[in-house]
Amino acid sequence: MSTPLQGIKVLDFTGVQSGPSCTQMLAWFGADVIKIERPGVGDVTRHQLRDIPDIDALYFTMLNSNKRSIELNTKTAEGKEVMEKLIREADILVENFHPGAIDHMGFTWEHIQEINPRLIFGSIKGFDECSPYVNVKAYENVAQAAGGAASTTGFWDGPPLVSAAALGDSNTGMHLLIGLLAALLHREKTGRGQRVTMSMQDAVLNLCRVKLRDQQRLDKLGYLEEYPQYPNGTFGDAVPRGGNAGGGGQPGWILKCKGWETDPNAYIYFTIQEQNWENTCKAIGKPEWITDPAYSTAHARQPHIFDIFAEIEKYTVTIDKHEAVAYLTQFDIPCAPVLSMKEISLDPSLRQSGSVVEVEQPLRGKYLTVGCPMKFSAFTPDIKAAPLLGEHTAVVLQELGYSDDEIAAMKQNHAI
């Protein structure tokens, strides 16, 4: 089966989550992704949060499927030579080291261009070069804090909160992926590679664009009418936290369902659409609200929006969350059950669609991992297990023209 990136070679100089999530997607699209790891150690996530002693952790296996792994010590002369040969044959190199680290290894962007002018160099950093935080070490929650997500997440009477979703890490990887694919297309026109940089702060901010919208509205109006604080609460000079309220102008909230007393996920998310208000009233047994001036418009409803949600909850609390969604969907009401990760891991529809897949690694055995979220009509990504540390070192070196004796000597010299 032909794949979009068949014949594209990627050097994966990344670790943890932001970089590996990007290069894993490139591998799913058919690229030959070679993960370059420190001899005897490898990516730090191989050892983090292990559930089986001395076996690659799920943290690693779920971010590095379909790749090849080589152990390479780029501090040695032989290791640098191998690296230069890899760069000469590669289409893309991706790194997410601390600022300046890859330069100190001897592989500046200028030197890389000399070796291979067609190479596309993808780089992830916590902050842009012009940021005052450029040298701050960044991880997931650091990026969420600096990108505007934490300050706008949580309840108005509580502290900022970080999201469980990887807005700082995997989201940054997906943003870089888009940039790399654009650079590949640009190379078709120009014949030259380019550097693509992505900061984690920028990636988070890009998902917080509606909050930047709200900041400008707040600056002009002094209030935000779709937030729970309106009209009885107070607004400061920055976008506040809105709890579970919808952020797109449609009021929404988390509502209890049957069993909520013992099941922490017995809830649904319920959205009130202006254009669907009549159906909403019929669904919850309040037809009189359709024409009542206190309820008939979004502006009229906002002062007592929580009373409305409380009334809706009187119904949802009597039935199972799945039954509630099935019933409300008949009235075209946007809603969804709050699904636990246990439910998601067992969901047959996600297995059928390939969004959750089971793969097998030689030492770990079978495990679940996320599949490709995009579905294509012309090909289906074949999700394979993550590589063992250095599993492909000899093969990759042989492809570069090294003999068995040379490979053995490099091993003896701790270059691999």
UniProtKB/Swiss-Prot annotation:
Q: Does the keyword Transferase apply?
A: yes
Q: Does the keyword RNA-binding apply?
A: no
Name of one Pfam family that matches: CoA_transf_3
Give the residues the record marks as binding CoA.
Answer: 17-18, 38, 72-75, 96-98, 104, 137-140, 273-275
Q: Which reaction does it catalyse?
A: formyl-CoA + oxalate = oxalyl-CoA + formate
| Binding residues for substrate | 248-250
Q: Which InterPro entries match?
A: CoA-transferase_III_domain (IPR050483), CoA-Trfase_fam_III (IPR003673), CoA-Trfase_III_dom3_sf (IPR044855), CoA-Trfase_III_dom_1_sf (IPR023606), Formyl_CoA_transfer (IPR017659)
Q: Give the record's keywords alphabetically.
A: Transferase
Q: Name one GO biological process term.
A: oxalate catabolic process
**Where in the sequence is the active site?**
169
Q: Which Gene3D superfamilies match?
A: Crotonobetainyl-coa:carnitine coa-transferase, domain 1, formyl-coa transferase, domain 3
Q: Which GO terms describe its molecular function?
A: formyl-CoA transferase activity
Q: What does this protein do?
A: Involved in the catabolism of oxalate and in the adapatation to low pH via the induction of the oxalate-dependent acid tolerance response (ATR). Catalyzes the transfer of the CoA moiety from formyl-CoA to oxalate.
Instruction: Please describe the quaternary structure of this protein.
Output: Homodimer.
Protein name, UniProt field: Formyl-CoA:oxalate CoA-transferase
Which organism encodes this protein? Shigella boydii serotype 18 (strain CDC 3083-94 / BS512)
Q: Which gene encodes it?
A: frc
